[in-house]
Amino acid sequence: MNRNSLFLVVLACALASAQNGGTTPSQTFHGWLSDAKCSRSRAASGLYTGTNPTCAKECVAGGAKIVLILPKEKKILDIENQDVARANLGNLVEVLGTTDARGKTIHIAALRLLEEGIAACERPKLSK
């Protein structure tokens, strides 16, 4: 392949990416909806679990953004369309959506409740 052909292939890929907004095809994710503040601090210590729903609702009411915590992937995604997620804040959900090219933001197309969150912090396991 000569340089001109290679350049045209790269240009075509860049244009195709720009046309779809740099998003990936729709994917399904399972995760917890929480506020960015609490979830990012927990993730920094290795915890990718649901957070206290009451606390998350208070933080979002105070201006924090809603995020999707992905426990299996050990990742947190920012949510582009916040209103879709607001009613299920603190819950475990299944989300169908597209992520940006960097895989850091998701646009939710559909959301399904899997399990309601409980207002409890991470507790140590009881010893027998």
Regions found by a protein language model. Name each.
Residues 10-19:
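Hydrophobic h-region of N-terminal signal peptides that target proteins for export
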